[in-house]
Regions:
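Short, Lys/Arg-enriched N-terminal segment that forms or immediately precedes the first helix
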Residues: 50-67
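Active-site- or DNA-interface-adjacent structural scaffold in DNA-acting proteins
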Residues: 109, 113-171
Length: 171
């Protein structure tokens, strides 16, 4: 039984749209997480992504019976992070259990320090994102990005400062 994301937030849990990132950080993890935050906040895009995930991840397994397992949101976040960082499962295991902002993105509160992901759980669940499924997700997300760019269509203006430097170069 998989859910997209648990409907009831826990005490101390921060909504994905309210997570603050260090905008001056030059690391790639906050950039990836900001992209996922935009995906989560765009209702239409989020619905189409999760409709695809629900239909493609273990389609023969009953969605109503069994234990809950990882949420589809957690699988998506871990899979995107693993691919964008070109990380192996050992690094992903360390990140999802220790990185504070990533744990907020996965839906853990400040009081969930004792909750951690097992290595094999990550391997089994992130492995459900096949290359074919990732290609379909990529198409949906790129179309959403193109719609975002089309909203801001207008006159493009550019500025640059330039000057001519006289040089005496001999080859």
């Amino acid at each position: 039984m998989r859910v997209v994301r648990t409907a009831q937030m826990e005490l101390g849990e921060i909504d994905v749209s309210q997570i603050k990132f260090d905008l001056r950080s030059r690391d790639d993890i906050p950039k990836v997480l900001r992209g996922l935050q935009h995906l989560y906040m765009n209702e239409e895009l989020r619905q189409s992504v999760f409709a695809l995930l629900e239909s493609e991840i273990a389609p023969k397994v009953s969605k109503r019976n069994g234990r809950s397992g990882m949420t589809l949101w957690s699988i998506l976040v871990c899979g995107v992070l693993r691919l964008d960082l070109n990380a192996d499962y050992d690094r992903l295991h360390e990140l999802v259990n220790q990185h504070k902002t990533l744990r907020e993105m996965l839906g853990h509160s400040l009081y969930d320090e004792d909750k951690s992901y097992a290595y094999q759980t990550l391997v089994d669940n992130v492995g459900l994102l096949t290359p074919e499924l990732l290609d379909k997700l990529n198409q949906i997300i790129v179309e959403g990005g193109h719609a975002l760019v089309k909203e801001g269509e207008g006159v493009l203006r550019g500025r640059c400062d330039s000057f001519v430097v006289e040089t005496d170069v001999h080859f």
